Amino acid sequence: MKLPAYIDMPFQEWKTSFSFFNKVSVRFSETDMFGHMNNVTPFIYFEEVRISYFKKLNMMSENKQTMTVVASQQCDYLRQVMPYEELRIYVKTSAVGSSSLTLHYLGENLEGEPCFTGAVVMVQVSKESGKAVSWTDEEKETLLHTR
């Protein structure tokens, strides 16, 4: 299997570097006319697991003056996923810049077979101005040590 550019190590090593995940069941409404999972569905799963991950890290609060926004994202599809399949959607921090963050994703079935992978670059911005805001040292430490 040809690896996407964002996976910079052997796939099995990359796969075992994840620990945080959500379980999902593919709903019939998430399929297309060909009977398999629609190509936009992984992005919904990525968003859901990302929110759970940020909550676990205590990085989401309505009182916080900043928020993270998606700058770019991609998904690479490895196998068909059918309605009602059970999946684990993993997320981990790959890199942290001054105000940016790269997350990696892995969607696999319960047999451990990878179904899709993904990456997203997010930027922390001020809720008021919309301008980029640097991560604090504490935030960087939290993000980098919770893979």
Curated annotation (Swiss-Prot):
SUPFAM superfamilies: Thioesterase/thiol ester dehydrase-isomerase (SSF54637). Gene3D superfamilies: Hotdog Thioesterase. It comes from the Bacteria. GO terms for molecular function: fatty acyl-CoA hydrolase activity. This is Uncharacterized protein YsmA. It comes from Bacillus subtilis (strain 168). The lineage of its organism: Bacteria, Bacillati, Bacillota, Bacilli, Bacillales. The gene is ysmA.
